């Protein structure tokens, strides 16, 4: 009877560990998705920075191709190569010099890179915790297998 209780305790602990493993895997997936979004935002900022630097080098009234979506473009003349309209959030936009816009982009990129580093650190911590839980679950599964084998031998003999 004591062997059966031991087997039940092992099963309960194993089920608890499996639930923990599933929770950790879910957290890791969410953090990976967050990192993907951050990296996408960084890439977008890099494209904007490159575009603004290109606009800054234009000499007034030069014709450029402006993307309108679905790999389609319109021809346009840039009349002001010193100022741009920049969104600052909540649907609000302000006029800034290109240099101010570039500085703002750099600040945003630094914030995003910091957030990415923090997310990657958290991901690494969760991966280590997951590995430890998986190791413990493997040990318990082996203990359970051994306990079941002993129970079969003593019950069959």
From Swiss-Prot:
Gene3D superfamilies assigned: 1.10.287.370
Keyword Chaperone in annotation: yes
Coiled-coil spans in chain: none
Organism superkingdom: Archaea
Molecular function via GO: unfolded protein binding
Keywords: Chaperone, Cytoplasm
Localization per record: Cytoplasm
SUPFAM superfamilies: Prefoldin
This protein's GO CC annotations: cytoplasm; prefoldin complex
One Gene Ontology term from the biological process aspect of the record: protein folding
Assembly and oligomerization: Heterohexamer of two alpha and four beta subunits.
Protein name, entry field: Prefoldin subunit alpha
Originating organism: Methanopyrus kandleri (strain AV19 / DSM 6324 / JCM 9639 / NBRC 100938)
Annotated gene: pfdA
């Amino acid at each position: 009877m004591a062997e059966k209780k031991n087997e039940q305790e092992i099963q309960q602990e194993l089920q608890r560990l499996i639930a923990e493993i599933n929770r950790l895997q879910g957290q890791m997936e969410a953090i990976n998705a967050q990192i993907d979004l951050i990296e996408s935002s960084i890439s977008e900022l890099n494209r904007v920075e490159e575009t603004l630097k290109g606009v800054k080098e234009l000499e007034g009234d030069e014709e450029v191709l402006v993307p309108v979506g679905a790999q389609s473009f319109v021809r346009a003349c840039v009349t002001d190569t010193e100022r741009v309209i920049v969104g600052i959030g909540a649907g609000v936009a302000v006029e800034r010099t290109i240099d101010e816009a570039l500085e703002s982009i750099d600040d945003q990129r630094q914030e995003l890179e910091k957030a990415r580093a923090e997310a990657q650190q958290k991901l690494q911590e969760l991966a280590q915790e997951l590995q430890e839980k998986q190791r413990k679950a493997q040990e318990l599964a082996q203990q359970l297998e051994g306990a079941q084998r002993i129970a079969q031998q003593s019950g069959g003999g």
